Amino acid sequence: PERLRFTFNTLRFTSMDEVEEFKPELVINAVTVKYTIPAFEEVMPHLPEDCIISDISSVKTGLKDFYSRCGHRYVSTHPMFGPTFANLNQLSHENAIIINEGDYMGRIFFKDLYNRLGLSIYEYSFEEHDKTVAYSLSIPFVSTFVFAAVMKHQDAPGTTFKRHMKIARGVLSEDDYLLQEIL
């Protein structure tokens, strides 16, 4: 296993043998939404029975059904900030959602973690989460795409225009898969 930079007490495994040998109590799946369930299916045969599996996916579609039949305890969360605009030194202005349908101890772990980071925590069902994401992520992303598509270069832009353009550039620089998943 290789130690990860900037992350304490975290190891990166490159083979399933390393996972089996380590016997994790909690696995956090942080792949893109498209690969969340396949990644779980690949690693689960190598996990102890009592291991809690966890995702931090921005879209929860299909996960509730998967979790109900997977045979593992689970916890599902969504840090509501990303690499484009979040200030990792000032997370007290950011939010996280914890799905209230998962394992109690898993939820306590993430509540503690997110509290230590200073995040505002909200608890929603899978369905409530996806409605919130549709409203708070999808609509702003789509409106930003429309803004970027119809705007032309301004020699003397106003403050609001400059801020909108900065946001548009940031959103358009996101990973294509992330944008596809959110939309």
Q: Where would I find each of the regions flagged by the language model?
A:
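NAD(P)-binding Rossmann-fold cofactor-contacting core
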Residues: 1-6, 12
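Redox-cofactor binding/interface segments in oxidoreductases and associated redox assembly factors
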Residues: 28-29, 54, 98
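ADP-ribose/adenylate-binding Rossmann-like module
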Residues: 47-63
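Rossmann-fold dinucleotide-binding core
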Residues: 59, 63-124
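Short, conserved loop/helix-junction motifs that constitute active-site signature segments
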Residues: 44-49, 90-91
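Rossmann-like NAD(P)-binding element
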Residues: 18-46
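An accessory alpha-helical subdomain
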Residues: 123-183
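Short acidic-hydrophobic, aromatic-tinged amphipathic segments that line or gate anion-handling sites
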Residues: 11-17, 122-125
